[in-house]
Amino acid sequence: MKQHLRPIMFVGTCSDAGKSVINAAFCRIFKQDGYQPAPFKAQNMSLNSYSTPEGGEMGRAQVVQAEACGISPHTDMNPILLKPTNDKSSQVVLNGKPVGNMSAKDYFGIQNQKEELFKEAIEAFKRLEARYNPIVLEGAGSISELNLRDRDITNMRMAIAAGASTYLVADIDRGGVFGSVYGTIALLRPEERVLMKGVIINKFRGDASLFEEGRSLLKELTGIPVVGVIPWFRDIKIEEEDSVALDMKNNTYKDGKINVAIILLKRMSNFTDFDVLEMDPRFNPYYTNNIDEIEKADIILLPGSKNTLSDLQSLRANGIAMAIIRAHKAGKKVIGICGGYQMMGVRLEDPESIEGNIPAIPGLGLLPQCTVIEQEKITRQSDFAFLPSSENKDCKGYEIHMGRTTLLGDAPEQPVARLEDGRTDGYYLNNRCWGSYMHGILDNPAVLDNLAEGFDTETTTGPFDYAAFKEEQYDKLAALVREHVDMEYIYNSIKN
């Protein structure tokens, strides 16, 4: 039996410092070394979410980390999820289930409520700790937001409760790494500082030996050692949850590929649905709201949305809706997932004002259906057959939506998928026009091959195995971090 290890936690000097990816790396390292690790983040804010086997909803960053651990995702790994519905409020998901919408002012301002949520987070952590060893915790944003510190339940307060050996991750690519590391550590309270075991410099470009003096200077300034300098990399593909990652993605057409325009929505959710297209050499996916780039594409994908009616209203106002309709008439493929699927119908209705103040709006009119937004939230995983009449019976996906879609008039039932329990999903008008509620549907080789039908590319390839590809990436990430981090020091800091 492996020695019990203390929890380890990675916190940041800023958002997008690379905490989630480093957390995933250590999840895989501990798994490789014979431990049974599990990830944990007390509170996450994201529109990229996932439905667990039990039907609970959680952030996708912890799903990626669970995959790196080789275990099934569970809502205990992310007990509190905030899903922004507009610029000022979010849906609160507690232990996998929605408990209502709250403004940021109310969420951070009601102290009793924050205490109750923190208790829920602690209980989830304890349940995980009873089953796994070690727990690999992740903080959120910067740990030095003094105006939020007394109400922060994700960072150093969680580190103290867990008794976690804590490491500060700093993004050197942004510049100002000395000030950010020194300032962050200087602002720690004594009970927080005692947990801080080391600093990891992330996203270093060039020869890391040139930072040796920097290591010494930071140790001298803070009293805390730099235990790793991780290089900037682009050749290891790990799913990223933060919307800031979209800024780094491709946004233009390329010759010789199947060009896929993914429509940028203000409240876009689950853009991770399209990560597989970046890995399959047949496709060139790009995120855009530029009409010229949309009309040049071979395939147009409408993603999910946390505020479908509002996003559709914007598409109508800025001319993108008409561009999609013109592209469809010109023979381009148009495919929608979840909210994008709802947009493809004749009409969307929100009679109870669940999403906002738009009671109804015409859809794109590409599919013979109407959607009514409802209070009940569907969250479930599904095994299904893609195009029920075909042999593609071993597909997997998951649903997260608040809406019921029904066919209009005498439209024939032409589902995209038939689920194991006999239910059907989506509408398949033809190879050029279909939609589905199923997140992760493109991760299935049969669906990718259907997407590629009818196109000639310079790339010839067999079926793309995304699951195997991801496993390779986790191993490559672990190898990179092992090479550039003092693992002996790390292990010594978490051995009881």
UniProtKB/Swiss-Prot annotation:
Role description: Catalyzes amidations at positions B, D, E, and G on adenosylcobyrinic A,C-diamide. NH(2) groups are provided by glutamine, and one molecule of ATP is hydrogenolyzed for each amidation.
Active-site residues (renumbered): C338 (nucleophile), H439
Q: Which family does it belong to?
A: Belongs to the CobB/CobQ family. CobQ subfamily.
Keyword set, alphabetical order: Cobalamin biosynthesis, Glutamine amidotransferase
- Keyword rRNA processing in the entry? The reply is no
Asked if the Swiss-Prot or TrEMBL record annotates the protein with the keyword Transmembrane, the reply is: no
Q: One Pfam family this chain carries?
A: CbiA
The molecular function GO annotations come to: ABC-type vitamin B12 transporter activity; catalytic activity
User: GO biological process annotations for this chain's record?
Assistant: cobalamin biosynthetic process
Domain GATase cobBQ-type, first and last residues per copy: 257-447
Q: Pathway listed for it?
A: Cofactor biosynthesis; adenosylcobalamin biosynthesis
Protein's recorded name: Cobyric acid synthase
Q: Which InterPro entries match?
A: Class_I_gatase-like, CobQ/CobB/MinD/ParA_Nub-bd_dom, CobQ_GATase1, CobQ_N, CobQ_synth, GATase_3, P-loop_NTPase
